[in-house]
Amino acid sequence: MEDAGQNPLDDEAEITEIPTLEAIKQNLKYLNSDLEKDLQRLDEANQILLRKIQKKEESIQSLERDIALSIGRVPERDDFNEILAQKETALKDLELESAKLEKKNKTLSKNVMELQKKISKGLKNIASDPETLKKKVTEFKVKLQKSTESCAQQEKEIAKMESDYQSVFQLCEDQAHYIKKYQEILREMEKEKEVMLLEKEISKAQNDSSQVVKPGSTLVETIQSNMEKNIIKKQKRKFWLRHFRYLFFMVMIVIRLLGYVFFHLQYVNPDFLVDTLPMLMSRSSLKWLRDILFPFLTLEVEDVLPH
């Protein structure tokens, strides 16, 4: 009788546990769907962030190229160098931060994928024990809280990085604007210099024409003649400079060859001339050369010797 009284109670407990288990399964399914949605959102946010980072890196690289080109044309100054060094360090720091954030995104995506796999395995291997289900639900909740916290931190870091990129981009734009203005000022100064030089040449030509006036000559002819004279002078100067360079290099080569010959005759083969001259010259020419060089090669030691 007691067994018969206990069996219906167990059946009633099992009947009450079945809907709870079904509710837990449904909750797990909802949690899995929410996790998948969060993962999709994270992937979309990561892709958007990567696109923004690539666009900003491309714009920063283009600005760096423009700045490098403008600096190659503009004379170097300490202020520009300091500003560019600061911006380069800031860009390097931002690139390091972006690399760190990309690594964090990769680790987060891996963790989320592992969570998905674990959830799918847990749904397949759901046990009938409510205690294990409750433990798994609590574990999933803890993991969800951790993932949401990490996502919030990542969003904060992304917002901070975007603000830093915007500030650096604005600074680069300002720098490029100032460099363009500086180039325009330099061009205007060069134009003014050219105008001044032309005015000086015209004044010289006018003075020359006022001092010596040729019959039928005009101011334009005098200016043309002066310009032709200047061009001829420049061409002559270039011609003489070119020939002077060639002459200088030839003299240097001859001096070096003479040095090599002297070294060879002094240290390597001192008897070279004695051996080769009889083969090249006749006896009469050798005698004549000996008579000429004999006074220079003999040593006068009579005054030095003791009496």
Curated annotation (Swiss-Prot):
This protein's record includes keyword Kinase: no
Topology in membrane: Single-pass membrane protein
GO CC annotation terms, alphabetical: membrane
Keyword tags: Coiled coil, Membrane, Transmembrane, Transmembrane helix
Highest taxon listed in the record's lineage: Eukaryota
TM annotation in the entry: 246-268
Coiled coil regions, renumbered to chain: 20-212
Xref: InterPro entries: SMCO2/5 (IPR026617)
Location within or outside the cell: Membrane
Pfam family for this entry, one: TMCO5
Annotated family: Belongs to the TMCO5 family.
Protein name: Transmembrane and coiled-coil domain-containing protein 5B
Organism: Mus musculus (Mouse)
Gene behind the chain: Tmco5b
